[in-house]
């Protein structure tokens, strides 16, 4: 579950957020993974209150409860809750992730391959996460090249224990993505099968590129 980030306002409607979470939790079968992404929308006290209520219903991770610059506040939230708190999707390079862990100490690190510095830099962040004993769960809101680069990098590390995000938020309709990149970018029964072809294993459909070019 992810809260809207376009009209950001702190603590906008925690009651509505909780009711939405409760409905989804009741809808999902027992044992199915469910996380909640606050999109930096809560204050410290509200994040702790919400997290405790989510814990009573069953939550697997609590993503970005606070603005990404509030590292001391993030530590307060992570220390107060049992649920794994995740952060890092807006952060760049291993040096910032060093500060994130030292000052905010989230349970899960979520680098985005586009904003964190690309595959080589993200691999270094993953290696640091292993040293810090932190699981990683990449942020990847674009099906296609973004997801494939992130998945290939993610597949190389031992602390890749959480589900990888699959989203078309910034990539357009999934049918268009499929037409552009082929079957390799589409999950099968919830799993991605990585190609062993050179690079990311993607071959652009030039006809589709022409068709979708504005």
Predicted regions and their residues:
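Glycine- and other small-residue-rich loops at beta-strand/loop junctions that grip anionic moieties
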Residues: 10-13, 36-43, 63-66, 88-89, ...
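Short, electropositive, low-hydrophobicity segments enriched in small/polar residues
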Residues: 62, 92, 194, 203-205
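Helix-coil boundary/capping segments in enzymes
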Residues: 192, 196-198
